Amino acid sequence: MYDLLKTIDDPADLRRLDRRQLQPLADELRAFVLDSVSKTGGHLSSNLGTVELTIALHYVFNTPNDRIVWDVGHQTYPHKILTGRRDQMHSLRQYDGISGFPRRSESEYDTFGTAHSSTSISAALGMAIGSQLNGDDRFSIAVIGDGAMTAGMAFEAMNNAGVSEDAKLLVILNDNDMSISPPVGALNRHLARLMSGRFYAAARAGVERVLSVAPPVLELARKLEEHAKGMVVPATLFEEFGFNYIGPIDGHDLDSLIPTLQNIRELRGPQFLHVVTKKGQGYKLAEADPVLYHGPGKFNPAEGIKPSTTPAKKTYTQVFGEWLCDEAERDTRVVGITPAMREGSGMVEFEKRFKDRYYDVGIAEQHAVTFAGGLATEGLKPVVAIYSTFLQRAYDQLIHDVALQNLPVVFAIDRAGLVGADGATHAGAYDLAFMRCIPNMTIMAASDENECRQMLHTALQQPNPTAVRYPRGAGTGVATVKEFTEIPLGKGEVRRRTSQPEGKRVAILAFGTMVAPSLAAAEELDATVANMRFVKPVDAALVRELAETHDYVVTVEEGCVMGGAGSACVEALMESGVIRPVLQLGLPDLFIDHGDPAKLLSQCGLDGAGIAKSIRERFLNPAADVAGQAKRVA
């Protein structure tokens, strides 16, 4: 099994194969990807669709001297397998294992780290120009999906690249969402080879030089050329950016891919190759339902993904989806917006029931936020469902287009905190810090499912921009209450009171997901716990009351410490004039790797045991007190 694949330890081994061996290799590689992902979980459909393209790129180009940048990066499992990581695939997305995305520190073949979309063309262009300036002769290749091409950044890069006439740059559009079959067969294959050949490029340049003295004739020639292409391929705007457009070609046909790429390798200037692939290629269940098999957990490939037979706790994403439908049913002004995350954000049912008020704007976070602001000016109630990590991409719009004008937009921020297997690129670590400094913002953090529902309802009633953050995955098991209750603005609640004597009283001010582990720590230490609820405006009165009645104050949040919720509490204490020792707990000042979320939180000291340990070591350890006193005396 995998007889050919076992011989490939790097692309140099691949390039030694005979062309006739490549399709059998592709079959083995596809089977290996399916087997690996079924055991570890991960992205499947997209990787099954890029097998032949990956083989062709490494076969034709001299990687790693030639650079390949994979947009988004979740389709790079075949690339990882062919570049020396075949025997590490069992650790994919596991703690201390290899990443599910390209990572420069992991391999020299991962030339640029990706995970967010639409960055590849900019990076590849920078590499191409950098190589020129350094006097290096190498190709830079960006592989980008049709979804990622909807983002403005991709077109900004195209616009810049088109004027770089000598750059050895290739942009490959991996089009896996075409509604019609790609043109295939001898004629299309011949056209792709012709359009990528040196004769075509040279002839075209020569004709343009000759006809430049007669602009009307040149324009006619251009129109005739475009019309000739249009008879066989889709009309293209890419040549308007200065690219030579080639395709579309079948991205699963190595006999088409390889000669086309070989021709392109001999050209200079920006080239654009349009390949058509199929998500889930070669695995019928994934072909039939690529969304279901986009990012599955472990499963049996022979049986496919089976519905769980054990009752599961409701996820926060489900809580949001149900809330949005309930609010839309009550109020026709409610509008739902998502930047290409319908399933991930829990908006499938909303789209079905309220299609005229559902807007999937594509991978366009900046547009989504400003679009919501425009809706708000017309008296509508826009709700932007967005992952914490992707809201970062629309920071200027959040400030300039929404908060500055104090527009009532609700931000439902999913995947707040650590996200597990996707790792640092997708962690929602920064939203509290980057939103808290924005005037007019109200920010809430949910501690359980029902509180999340009521916070979302509260947010919808506010006359200003309001954010509710909640984590990925299942909640605590708390039932949601159908009736809505508006939470008093800026008010937290005490969930547990200490019975400790003076001198040992600890108050834990917990935010969102950290309420439950803080309560666990408090049981061990006999501490007071407050569910702060609001990060902005923080409950300054509650902060002062607890500081005045306790000896030590601890803040706990699942976000970066610097500038976060704990900082809000410290600022409130300073404003009140109450001086108390404060311990701020949260995510450390580093990018936290992928792994099991519970294990990662434990590693960060943010489970019950870790919180108790930190408090004990800082405030309640007699040995530490004695050492501290001795140090002060000295």
From Swiss-Prot:
Pathway: Metabolic intermediate biosynthesis; 1-deoxy-D-xylulose 5-phosphate biosynthesis; 1-deoxy-D-xylulose 5-phosphate from D-glyceraldehyde 3-phosphate and pyruvate: step 1/1. InterPro entries: Dxylulose-5-P_synthase (IPR005477), THDP-binding (IPR029061), Transketo_C/PFOR_II (IPR009014), Transketolase-like_Pyr-bd (IPR005475), Transketolase_BS (IPR020826), Transketolase_C (IPR033248), Transketolase_CS (IPR049557). It is an enzyme of class 2 (transferase). It comes from the Bacteria. SMART domains: Transket_pyr. It catalyses: D-glyceraldehyde 3-phosphate + pyruvate + H(+) = 1-deoxy-D-xylulose 5-phosphate + CO2. Binds 1 Mg(2+) ion per subunit. Binds 1 thiamine pyrophosphate per subunit. Thiamine diphosphate binds at residues 74, 115-117, 147-148, 176, 283, 365. PROSITE patterns: TRANSKETOLASE_1 (PS00801), TRANSKETOLASE_2 (PS00802). One of its GO terms (molecular function) is 1-deoxy-D-xylulose-5-phosphate synthase activity. Keywords: Isoprene biosynthesis, Magnesium, Metal-binding, Thiamine biosynthesis, Thiamine pyrophosphate, Transferase. GO terms for cellular component: cytosol. Its cofactor is Mg(2+); thiamine diphosphate. SUPFAM superfamilies: Thiamin diphosphate-binding fold (THDP-binding), TK C-terminal domain-like. Its EC number is 2.2.1.7. Mg(2+) binds at residues 146, 176. GO terms for biological process: 1-deoxy-D-xylulose 5-phosphate biosynthetic process; isopentenyl diphosphate biosynthetic process, methylerythritol 4-phosphate pathway; terpenoid biosynthetic process; thiamine biosynthetic process. Catalyzes the acyloin condensation reaction between C atoms 2 and 3 of pyruvate and glyceraldehyde 3-phosphate to yield 1-deoxy-D-xylulose-5-phosphate (DXP). Belongs to the transketolase family. DXPS subfamily. PANTHER family: 1-D-DEOXYXYLULOSE 5-PHOSPHATE SYNTHASE-RELATED (PTHR43322), 1-DEOXY-D-XYLULOSE-5-PHOSPHATE SYNTHASE, CHLOROPLASTIC (PTHR43322:SF5). Homodimer. This is 1-deoxy-D-xylulose-5-phosphate synthase. The gene is dxs.
